[in-house]
């Protein structure tokens, strides 16, 4: 019996315990109820009664030795796993992760919406894929107007005698839809993307953002229009900005004007951006043509109104003193990071 205990002790001492799998195999072989140590305990009753206490003590030592090996191996493996993990120094300062922000076009558009909202304008939107009748006919464009040519407009589908489908060239069709659906008085702004078949340069792009405004009520005058534009320009560009109104022509307004502000780069002295004039155009405007009002089912003898439209992207250039409109569409993260809030 003593030889069996000694032999088993040598096996226990020599058994490799380098992994959790080794420990589990060791436990199943030696320390479980039907293991080798338990088998020796079952033979204890056949030992001479005078030797039984001594042999029983040796068996207990054998069992404790096996359990001690299991505990030591488990602790060693656990310590090794912990030491192999990367140490996190909680005293180090945290890393500031990059956070995105609104695109400069959206930032400026949001400010424009806020200004006009404070003046009482509601917001209206419409489809970018538009019908020829809404984009041209109802806005008093004659059939031979240059804007109807393929060189200026992206036509999606030519339908012969029916309505052509095109990418809208301005957000004015939204004004038409509003006048058809809502009774006056009407006071809305219409922001959105528009498309024109233009050469891409530092000052123009084939797709850009526009915001137009419409006010229909009784007794509306050009003086009301000027007051609105002056208020917007001073809030958007600063109270020291200078404006000028130049006579112009638009099929949907009469009289019509274009509005210029002093150049943001040269302060009115003349540079390449303003083409040495000292002025930059920011919008077109005018009194809504009676034909347009009548086309929308409103009596022009009773109701009058004004409309204006501006390129949001050009306003961004003015606001942030950017000299190339193409930068707004390139998604260059180096440029956009400058606008992180």
UniProtKB/Swiss-Prot annotation:
Keywords: Aminoacyl-tRNA synthetase, ATP-binding, Cytoplasm, Ligase, Magnesium, Metal-binding, Nucleotide-binding, Protein biosynthesis. The keyword Ligase applies. One of its GO terms (biological process) is phenylalanyl-tRNA aminoacylation. It catalyses: tRNA(Phe) + L-phenylalanine + ATP = L-phenylalanyl-tRNA(Phe) + AMP + diphosphate + H(+). This is Phenylalanine--tRNA ligase alpha subunit. Its main location: cytoplasm. Mg(2+) binds at residue 254. Its cofactor is Mg(2+). Binds 2 magnesium ions per tetramer. One of its GO terms (cellular component) is cytoplasm. The keyword Metal-binding applies. Tetramer of two alpha and two beta subunits. It is an enzyme of class 6 (ligase). It comes from Chlorobium phaeovibrioides (strain DSM 265 / 1930). One of its GO terms (molecular function) is magnesium ion binding. It comes from the Bacteria. Belongs to the class-II aminoacyl-tRNA synthetase family. Phe-tRNA synthetase alpha subunit type 1 subfamily. InterPro entries: aa-tRNA-synth_II, aa-tRNA-synth_II/BPL/LPL, Phe-tRNA-synth_IIc_asu, Phe-tRNA_ligase_II_N, Phe_tRNA_ligase_alpha1_bac, Phenylalanyl-tRNA_Synthase, tRNA-bd_arm. SUPFAM superfamilies: Class II aaRS and biotin synthetases (SSF55681), tRNA-binding arm (SSF46589).
